Structure formats: structure tokens, C-alpha cells
Swiss-Prot record:
Keyword Signal: no
Cysteine-cysteine disulfides: none
Descriptive protein name: Endoribonuclease YbeY
Keyword Cytoplasm listed: yes
Primary location group: cytoplasm
Binding residues for Zn(2+): 126, 130, 136
Source organism of the structure: Bradyrhizobium sp. (strain BTAi1 / ATCC BAA-1182)
Compartment annotation: Cytoplasm
Primary gene name: ybeY
């Protein structure tokens, strides 16, 4: 049986505020699918966990893992993978975890006058790209990552999230 290009994705609702967004899980699954189909990475045998949390939860994660004591919109935690060939009996590999904060995400969507689902799609794609090695530490990395995000989001019918901002030179 051929391997699916789509990683297994578990969505964990860790904060009650997400109950107001009953379509959030579907939005996340569509965003992961679109990203997985458009990247040059083998992710079909992998697993991802996406935790939908609140500002307090993501602030704790941000403080513990990055030393930054404030909430943020999304955090990604790529899993460390063993090297070498995988055997047929190996369990699926863990690609990593993504955490998304409701209040910060809602505020950003409102301030930028974007539909909530569009911003959720963007943050999910952004987090997924971090899991497979993309970053935005340098201008060149940011430009590459933003271009890929924009391409993936276009396939979801989401406008370029960077269109209202000056592009990096």
C-alpha cells in the first residue's frame, strides 16, 4: 500500500476558549494537508500534535523553552529523530508539536481584519514549516519561508498574509 503524503495529526484542545471555534480542527487538518503536499520533505509516516491553548498556556511554554516570559501566537517543537534507515517494524516517527494561543491569535486576526480561519491556517502552516526545518532567523530564510507559506495558503484560498507589509529586500 503506498504511503500517504499526509502526516497523522492529532489536535488537542487544551483551553476552553477554543470551544467557540468548532471548525478549528478541520482548518488545521486542511492546512497540514496543503503544506505536506507542497513541501520537499517526507512527512507521510510522521505524526504531529497540535495543541490549541490559551495565552497562559503558551506563555508558560514560551518561558520554559525560550526564556521569553510572554505569550506568543504559535510555537513549534521539532522532534529529535534517530539517524539511520528505518525498519519495517518502526513506529511512526514524531515530527513534532505545534502550540497555538487563542487570545493572541484572535487579537491579531481582529487587528489585521483577517478571518479567524485564515489566520489559524497561516499559523498552522508556519508551525508545520518550522517542524520540517524552515526558519526565519536571517532575511534570506524569512523570504524563503514566507514565499512558501504564501504559496501553500493560496491553495487554501487564503490571501497572502504578508501582502500589507513591505517585502524583505
Amino acid at each position: 500500500m503506498p504511503q500517504s503524503p499526509i502526516p497523522t495529526t492529532e489536535v488537542i484542545i487544551a483551553a476552553d476558549c477554543w470551544q467557540d471555534q468548532p471548525d478549528a480542527e478541520d482548518v488545521i487538518h486542511r492546512a497540514i494537508l496543503a503544506a505536506a503536499e507542497r513541501v520537499d520533505a517526507e512527512v507521510g509516516d510522521a505524526e504531529i500534535a497540535v495543541m490549541l491553548t490559551d495565552d497562559a498556556g503558551i506563555r508558560t511554554l514560551n518561558s520554559n523553552w525560550r526564556g521569553i516570559d510572554k505569550p506568543t501566537n504559535v510555537l513549534s517543537f521539532p522532534a529529535l529523530q534517530p539517524t539511520g534507515p528505518r525498519g519495517d517494524d518502526d513506529a511512526p516517527r514524531m515530527l513534532g508539536d505545534i502550540a497555538i494561543a487563542y487570545e493572541t491569535m484572535r487579537r491579531e486576526a481582529d487587528e489585521e481584519q483577517k478571518p479567524f480561519d485564515h489566520h489559524l491556517s497561516h499559523l498552522t502552516v508556519h508551525g508545520f514549516l518550522h517542524l520540517i526545518g524552515y526558519d526565519h532567523e536571517s532575511d534570506a530564510e524569512a523570504e524563503e519561508m514566507e514565499a512558501l507559506e504564501t504559496e501553500i495558503l493560496a491553495h487554501l484560498g487564503v490571501p497572502d498574509p504578508y501582502a500589507d507589509r513591505e517585502r524583505l529586500d
